[in-house]
Structure formats: structure tokens, C-alpha cells
Amino acid sequence: MSTQIKSRQPFYWGILHGINDLVAGFLLAGYTLTHNYSDSFLFISLYAILGFGGQLPVGFWLDKKKEIRFFAKISLFLLPLSVLLFFVSAEAAIISSGMASAFVHVTGGTICLQ
């Protein structure tokens, strides 16, 4: 990979991070507008557990596997999958979005630290 492309990667992952947060906000807001309080609280909590708590196991996995490309592909697969799932099952979309968030944060952070 050329040095010029590699030097732009943190910028691209920063953009992806913003898109990831936008998608998560859209999914969670859409869910809370159409579901009761207890269901909304449950899925917001589940998103937070997966998205933030999931960063530690994903980080350990990335450290062990040492293949950033594999984790980048997972990130780029899960994020659009979350949007598509929203039209089938909002709950599945939120779960997918939480996992995508963990992968986006860990992979992007690793790329930025290189």
C-alpha cells in the first residue's frame, strides 16, 4: 500500500466513525419512537453493551489475529447490514449496529495508532 493512501486512512476511518454514530443514532431514535419505554431501554442498553463493552474482546481478538484487513471487512459489512436489517427487524439492526460500532472503533483506533 502506498504511503499516500496509508496516510489518508485515519481520515477515512474518522468519516466512517461519524457514519457509524449517525446510523446508530438513527436506528435507536427510530426504535424509541415506535416502541414502549421498557423495550427502548433494553435495546439502548444492549447497544451500549455491545458497542462499548464489545471493544475489549474485539481488541483482544485483533491483537491475537493481527489482520487489520479482516477486521476492516467485518466493520464495512456490519454497518450497511444494520441499515438493511432495520427494515426487517429493528432489534436485529440494533444488535448488528452495536457489533459494527465495536469493530469500527477498534479497527479505526488501531489504524490511527500506526
Region annotations inferred by a language model:
Residues F103-Q114:
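Intracellular juxtamembrane helix-capping segments at the cytosolic ends
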Residues L76-E91:
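C-terminal ends and interior cores of transmembrane alpha-helices
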Residues F26, G30, P57, V106-G108:
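Transmembrane alpha-helix boundary/hinge residues in polytopic small-molecule transporters
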Residues T3-A48:
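Helix-loop boundary and gating motifs at the non-cytosolic
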Residues F41-D63:
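Central cavity-lining transmembrane alpha-helices of secondary-active solute carriers
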Residues T32, G59-D63, L113:
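Membrane-water interface at transmembrane helix exits
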Residues A92-S97:
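Paired small-residue
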Residues D63-L76:
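Cytoplasmic membrane-interface "Motif A"-like loop-to-helix N-cap segments
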